[in-house]
Every structure is written in structure tokens, then in C-alpha cells.
Swiss-Prot record:
<dbReference type="InterPro" id="IPR029044">
    <property type="entry name" value="Nucleotide-diphossugar_trans"/>
</dbReference>
<protein>
    <recommendedName>
        <fullName>2-C-methyl-D-erythritol 4-phosphate cytidylyltransferase</fullName>
        <ecNumber>2.7.7.60</ecNumber>
    </recommendedName>
</protein>
<comment type="function">
    <text>Catalyzes the formation of 4-diphosphocytidyl-2-C-methyl-D-erythritol from CTP and 2-C-methyl-D-erythritol 4-phosphate (MEP).</text>
</comment>
<keyword id="KW-0548">Nucleotidyltransferase</keyword>
<dbReference type="InterPro" id="IPR001228">
    <property type="entry name" value="IspD"/>
</dbReference>
<comment type="pathway">
    <text>Isoprenoid biosynthesis; isopentenyl diphosphate biosynthesis via DXP pathway; isopentenyl diphosphate from 1-deoxy-D-xylulose 5-phosphate: step 2/6.</text>
</comment>
<feature type="site" description="Transition state stabilizer">
    <location>
        <position position="16"/>
    </location>
</feature>
<feature type="site" description="Positions MEP for the nucleophilic attack">
    <location>
        <position position="216"/>
    </location>
</feature>
<feature type="site" description="Transition state stabilizer">
    <location>
        <position position="23"/>
    </location>
</feature>
<feature type="site" description="Positions MEP for the nucleophilic attack">
    <location>
        <position position="160"/>
    </location>
</feature>
<keyword id="KW-0414">Isoprene biosynthesis</keyword>
<dbReference type="InterPro" id="IPR034683">
    <property type="entry name" value="IspD/TarI"/>
</dbReference>
<dbReference type="InterPro" id="IPR050088">
    <property type="entry name" value="IspD/TarI_cytidylyltransf_bact"/>
</dbReference>
<keyword id="KW-0808">Transferase</keyword>
<comment type="similarity">
    <text>Belongs to the IspD/TarI cytidylyltransferase family. IspD subfamily.</text>
</comment>
<dbReference type="InterPro" id="IPR018294">
    <property type="entry name" value="ISPD_synthase_CS"/>
</dbReference>
<dbReference type="Pfam" id="PF01128">
    <property type="entry name" value="IspD"/>
</dbReference>
Length: 237
């Protein structure tokens, strides 16, 4: 099987979070959010390398190293991200090619602000790749009733049949994902996740059921929820 790499884009500042520092560096149970994010991948023997993509000033000042400490294998030296998430992912993929990855290798892209990824979900995604030539992503079926809003009022109910919430990691062949992101950039298309870039190229990635507690820390309230999730797991042993 081709090697598996990980790209963790953390080039943004998370303006919606409202903290003075980037949300990936905010402390969660006495460790930065991004340290919890990395922990899900460390120790997995199928992962050849983990590529962090960070703001340029964080790399220049070494702020990331002060927060994360020594780089455990297989964490690679970070690279500077771009203005948009898709740009940061693209730059991370290019860095992996310079590190010895090849286009046929698999790459998992995971949000830096998702610190609650379960190891069992990661393993399920990795195991799915043998039968997912067009890629795969963790997702959960939509359970809530969905409303369409107009001028602050509900104007209708959206049929949730067949709807899923996309999570990360999302896994694709490195070369194909890089080409899809470059095509989206050339066409000035909005890319919300890696699957959307691949879907625009006609790909149909597999939806791998994950857990809803793989939340993204976007608002300050999310940090309290993430802390509760991690605390509950710690108590479970």
C-alpha cells in the first residue's frame, strides 16, 4: 500500500474565536489545542510524516516550538501557510513532495482545531482506503431538523434524507488532491473542504461514519465542550 501522510493546516487566526492568540494555541486541559490534535496521529505506524502548516510569523519567531516543545517523529518541520485554508493545504502538499512523498501516496488533511478525533475513527478511515480509490472522509449523518432562513425567519424545512456533516480527516491521493486544489484556484472557486475540490473534478469519495464528538473549535463555547469530551474519555480510561 502507498504511504500515508498527514497535513494539518493551521495558517489562519480564527477571528470568530475571539481570543488574542490563534485558537490552535489556546490551552485545552493544560495543553494547546493543536497538541491534542497531533496526539491522535502520533504513534500510528502507517503514517510516514505529519506536515504542519502555520502562519509565517509563528515559524519566524519560533512561537509554535515554545508551545509544542520538541518535534516528535514523524512530525516534519512546519511550512508557511497561505491566506485561505485551501492555499495552506496546497502548500502543505507541495512540502510533502519535497520531503519525498510521491503523487500516488495518500494524504489525510485534518483541521488543526479538531482536537477530539478518536483513534478508532482514524483507524476506520485508514482501513477504508484499500477500497476507496476515489478517497474517503469521516462524516456523520445529519440528525437535527434543518430550517431555511430568510430575514431571520424560518421559510421552510430542508429534507435531511441523505445529508451528512463532513468532518476531518479527509483522505485522497496526494497528486490528485493537489491538482484539484490548483484547478479550483485557477478557476477562482470557493473550496470549503478537500472533498469539495475533488467533487468538482468528478470524484465521489466514500463517506466513513465517524463520531459527532469530533468537533471543530470555532467559538469560545466549543472549547468548553472539547474539554468536557476529553475529560470524559480520560475518566473512561
Amino acid at each position: 500500500m502507498e504511504r500515508v501522510w498527514v497535513v494539518i493546516p493551521a495558517g489562519g487566526r480564527g477571528q470568530r474565536f475571539g481570543a488574542a492568540q490563534a485558537k490552535q494555541y489556546v490551552l485545552l486541559r493544560d495543553r494547546p489545542v493543536i497538541a491534542h490534535t497531533l496526539a491522535a496521529f502520533l504513534g500510528e505506524p502507517r503514517i510516514a510524516g505529519i506536515q504542519l502548516v502555520l502562519p509565517g510569523e509563528d515559524i519566524a519567531t519560533g512561537a509554535w516550538r515554545e508551545l509544542l516543545g520538541p518535534m516528535p517523529a514523524p512530525l516534519l518541520p512546519p511550512v508557511v501557510g497561505g491566506g485561505l485554508r485551501a492555499d495552506s493545504v496546497r502548500l502543505g502538499l507541495e512540502a510533502l513532495l519535497r520531503q519525498g512523498a510521491v503523487p500516488s501516496d495518500w494524504v489525510l488533511v485534518h483541521d488543526a482545531a479538531r482536537p477530539c478525533l478518536r483513534r478508532e475513527d482514524l483507524l476506520r478511515l485508514l482501513e477504508s482506503l484499500a477500497n476507496a480509490p476515489q478517497g474517503a472522509l469521516l462524516a456523520v449523518p445529519v440528525a437535527d431538523t434543518l430550517k431555511r432562513g430568510e430575514d431571520g425567519c424560518s421559510s421552510g424545512t430542508v429534507d435531511r434524507e441523505g445529508l451528512w456533516r463532513a468532518l476531518t480527516p479527509q483522505a485522497f491521493p496526494l497528486g490528485a488532491l493537489l491538482a484539484a486544489l490548483e484547478a479550483a484556484r485557477a478557476g477562482n472557486r470557493q473550496i470549503t473542504d478537500e472533498a469539495s475540490a475533488m467533487e468538482a473534478q468528478g470524484w465521489r469519495p466514500r463517506l466513513i461514519p465517524g463520531h459527532g464528538d469530533n468537533i471543530k473549535v470555532t467559538l469560545s463555547d466549543d472549547l468548553m465542550l472539547a474539554a468536557a469530551i476529553l475529560a470524559a474519555r480520560s475518566e473512561e480510561g
